[in-house]
Amino acid sequence: MTLPFKAIISDLDGTLLNAEHKIGDFTIKILSELSQKGVDVYIATGRNLPDVQHIIRKVNVDEAMLVTSNGARANFLSGECVLNHHLPEELAFKLMNIEFDPTRVCVNSYQGDEWFINIDLESLRKYHKDSGFMYQVVDFAQHHGRQTEKVFFIGRELADLLPIEQKIRETYGDQVYTVYSTPQCLEVMNNSVSKANALEELAERIGSVSYTHLTLPTT
């Protein structure tokens, strides 16, 4: 039977992952069956590559395309990199060290295959139990901006993040793209980065799926 679509695109959190932040057996079964029928599987998420690889390897989808860090990077499940759009090193370092209230906000970065944070925040661990992907606590003033896919700020509430967003917009303007993944998480990427842009670029590069066939996320 010919399926009416050539590809499926899904996020992870709130979509493929269940309430325990794991991928369920039924979801694994459906994705595996679709892949065996020739449907291309795209995962587009704000998570980092090693985190996503561990989750998706449970599915029999050898050629899954993983769009990670909100579109800053795309790799086949095997690890082969197809695209990446890092923040400039100096800009990334400045973002990591922007002023904020450390009692209300923490700063994180995804850099290559690593996750860095300025404090140990145990509440984040539940989201990564399945993959085991874990942060490293660093002093960002002594850190570096190499291979930065995104810098993100987690606040106790939205009001804690609004001054940071305003400062970033006023200082860096169109050099960066900002988005709230949740009301408590402000994410900052290169100005060309979004899931939609990454998927469009992949469609043009790979050619197996026409851009017109893709229903694209907006972040």
Give residue spans per PLM region.
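A general structural motif
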Residues: 2-5, 38, 63, 104, ...
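Asp-based phosphoryl-transfer active-site loop
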Residues: 6-19
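Conserved strand-loop elements at the edges of beta-sheets that form or border functional pockets
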Residues: 10, 68, 180-181
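Residue-level recognition of oxygen-bearing side chains
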Residues: 22, 26, 194
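Active-site phosphate-binding/coordination module
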Residues: 25-124
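Conserved acidic, metal-coordinating active-site core of Asp-based
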Residues: 102-214
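A short, hydrophobic C-terminal helix/tail in secreted or cell-surface proteins
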Residues: 215-219
